[in-house]
């Protein structure tokens, strides 16, 4: 393969978008031009967190000059352990994205572990209301087994549903507005560990607490 230099597609115009832009990916999505990069050393401003991020730029592409004039920049994922995503086209035209579920700022695996981090579940990308909308690829549904359904279940205090268990779940919960202040679902719970998903009704806050999630 012989490569020829053509132009600088895009660059940080004012020095506010980190230092090196890693793993760039440029493509057209629903008639919008998108540039995905993973800039290092971003400052915590607006929707960006401190350190390494994954972001996407939206704007206009000059095909003659081969220059991308970005107009808007958004965070691609709010988690710290999502980095260097890349996309591909499925045979049916869907834009699919896979990321590295790790970050250079995260702790490297312990010496006695035989694996280090993993890749994310592939996501389908679409444009909705001027932003990228992400959903798990529809092929995930082929892995669903042993469906359990509870309807009109009234919960008071602690409640454990014996039929719902396991380390891998795809769960949909519909909560009817009622007289409650806080609603919590504890995942992967045993004597030592649990991960809590909490809805605070009064403050309209949603919290994922991984304090006791373990490694």
PLM regions with names:
Residues 1, 5-8, 23-27, 32-44, ...:
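Hydrophobic core segments of beta-strands in well-ordered, beta-rich domains
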Residues 16-17, 45-51, 113-116:
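Short consensus segments that form the blades of beta-propeller domains
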Residues 8-13, 73-76:
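Short loop/turn motifs that cap or connect beta-strands within the blades
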Residues 55, 60-80, 86-215:
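Beta-rich accessory regions
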Residues 15-21, 78-81:
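Short glycine-/Asp-/Thr-/Trp-enriched loop segments that recur within the blades
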Residues 13, 25, 119, 123:
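Solvent-exposed, flexible loop/coil residues
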Residues 22-25, 83-86:
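Beta-propeller and closely related beta-sheet repeat lectin domains
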